[in-house]
Amino acid sequence: MADPYRSNGSAAYDLAAGKLLFCHEIRLDLWQTVRECMTLFPDLTVEVQGLDAHYRFTENPAWDAFSDHNQCAHGLARPGDDLGPFLKFTLYGEFRDVTVASMFDGTPEEVRRMDDAEAQLKARFGGCCEVFRAATRIIDVHAKGVSKNRSARELQQRLGRKILVCMGDAENDISMLEGADWSFCPADGIVADRF
């Protein structure tokens, strides 16, 4: 059986050894970026993903429940806290349920709001970051050039493997699934009809 590895695009981990294999950092000041996003998008939840946890910057019990349900280590960060390398930040719309699948639903107003936020992020950070819609109410921002496919291929190369096998279930997994030698999508995955 293959060793378990996990990658979100910005970082790859060897779960069995409990170690980071590689990461791609955003070349911006973390706290300046957080302040700017919180000012531009006061109605959205801003999250920063570090090596060890996901961090929020305001009290949000719904985000806590979402993170707990999805088994994400998380915490509340304060300005100046050392969150480690700046790997990724995310904007979330309203949390109505604890499942990731629930974030794919949105009212027309929510879709327009997230479209506007995505356009603003691309205009502001597109020169140094990859901005993409992970779900109807989730926008992810990674370092420039980062994608799940690129990271999966980097992991394959580092491990000396000939065949890349990937599994995913959502829109943000499509480039990785299409770029893999073998790909799998659960039958109930959001993009299952494409595979």
List the predicted regions and their residue ranges.
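Hydrophobic packing residues within well-ordered alpha-helices of enzyme cores
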Residues: 1, 121, 191-193
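Active-site phosphate-binding/coordination module
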Residues: 1-62
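Short, polar loop motifs at secondary-structure junctions
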Residues: 9, 171, 187-190
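Active-site-proximal flexible loops/turns
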Residues: 15, 176, 180
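Conserved acidic, metal-coordinating active-site core of Asp-based
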Residues: 44-167, 171-176
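Asp-based, Mg2+/Mn2+-dependent phosphohydrolase catalytic module
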Residues: 181-195
